[in-house]
Amino acid sequence: MSDENIRQIAFYGKGGIGKSTTSQNTIAALAEMGERIMIVGCDPKADSTRLMLHSKAQTTILHLAAERGAVEDLELEEVLLTGYRDVKCVESGGPEPGVGCAGRGIITAINFLEENGAYEDLDFVSYDVLGDVVCGGFAMPIREGKAQEIYIVTSGEMMAMYAANNIARGILKYAHSGGVRLGGLICNSRKVDREIELIETLAQRLNTQMIHFVPRDNIVQHAELRRMTVNEYAPDSAQAQEYATLARKIKDNTNLTIPTPISMDELEDLLVEFGLLGGDEEYEKAIKQDLAKRGA
């Protein structure tokens, strides 16, 4: 396998942040620019390719391997499907809830794809990875040097920023051994007060950039109901142009850095600074008011 010229990128982000939606819309825009791309879904929900394939959920490598008895019994054509603009689509899958490690599917899938020539004739490979925790399995694309550029999907909400900081910590751990770098934060807007300024400040603290701010628009949900990307559903819309702009920024991005994660105290101080979290005095005042109400 010769993959030296392939741009291997990964989208990480906490569950529910819109990571898979953002990544698929961005990849669709890249494909429209003529790029040859494969998506490797690394989320147990197996929803990383459904907008590209116009389907509910793609059958995963791990599911088929369990049915057959071993991953060696699979054919590449069974798990690699072609979607919108000829984007190749694969879902690694995960075990039954409460049994085994979800990261195992990622390791199994990538090894299978490599051994069967799936990485040939590509410009980009995009890994869509669950990012609430960067455990051994979910860190596999980073740890093994597969994904070289990480884009973190976040918002101005505290838990999304907390997850982004944790992911940055995971990138730092493998930056020197695997060569992985942080490409930037993608702010998928939740309409939080001063959200652009907040994420730009977080990006500075993490030694990276806010590569793009994706505004909130109901057209995204309208497209998802039809299992389509916005680019396909409403190509002339303002939101489609936002994803095209993000895709162009990623394509041209050379600002790849080793992140500098911050402490929980620093993150909370940042939220206090932007008025999204009360300081100690406000906290104590709120507690006193609550106790007074209970005593009344």
UniProtKB/Swiss-Prot annotation:
Q: Which residues bind [4Fe-4S] cluster?
A: 101, 135
Reading the lineage from the top rank, the first entry is: Bacteria
Record's function text: The key enzymatic reactions in nitrogen fixation are catalyzed by the nitrogenase complex, which has 2 components: the iron protein and the molybdenum-iron protein.
What is the protein's given name?
A: Nitrogenase iron protein
Please give the cofactor(s) recorded in the UniProt entry for this protein: [4Fe-4S] cluster
Source species taxonomy: Bacteria, Bacillati, Cyanobacteriota, Cyanophyceae, Leptolyngbyales
Supply the InterPro entries for this chain.
NifH/chlL_CS, NifH/frxC, Nitrogenase_Fe_NifH, P-loop_NTPase
UniProt-listed GO biological process terms = nitrogen fixation
| Positions of ATP binding | 13-20
Please state the Enzyme Commission number of this protein: 1.18.6.1
Chain positions found as ADP-ribosylarginine: 104
Co-factor binding details: Binds 1 [4Fe-4S] cluster per dimer.
PANTHER family linked to this entry: LIGHT-INDEPENDENT PROTOCHLOROPHYLLIDE REDUCTASE IRON-SULFUR ATP-BINDING PROTEIN
Q: Does the keyword Chloroplast apply?
A: no
**Reaction catalysed?**
N2 + 8 reduced [2Fe-2S]-[ferredoxin] + 16 ATP + 16 H2O = H2 + 8 oxidized [2Fe-2S]-[ferredoxin] + 2 NH4(+) + 16 ADP + 16 phosphate + 6 H(+)
The UniProt entry's sequence similarity note says:
Belongs to the NifH/BchL/ChlL family.
Give the quaternary structure. Answer: Homodimer.
- PTM statement from Swiss-Prot or TrEMBL: The reversible ADP-ribosylation of Arg-104 inactivates the nitrogenase reductase and regulates nitrogenase activity.
This entry's Gene Ontology molecular function terms read: 4 iron, 4 sulfur cluster binding; ATP binding; metal ion binding; nitrogenase activity
Q: Does the entry feature the keyword Iron-sulfur, yes or no?
A: yes
Q: Which UniProt keywords apply?
A: 4Fe-4S, ADP-ribosylation, ATP-binding, Iron, Iron-sulfur, Metal-binding, Nitrogen fixation, Nucleotide-binding, Oxidoreductase
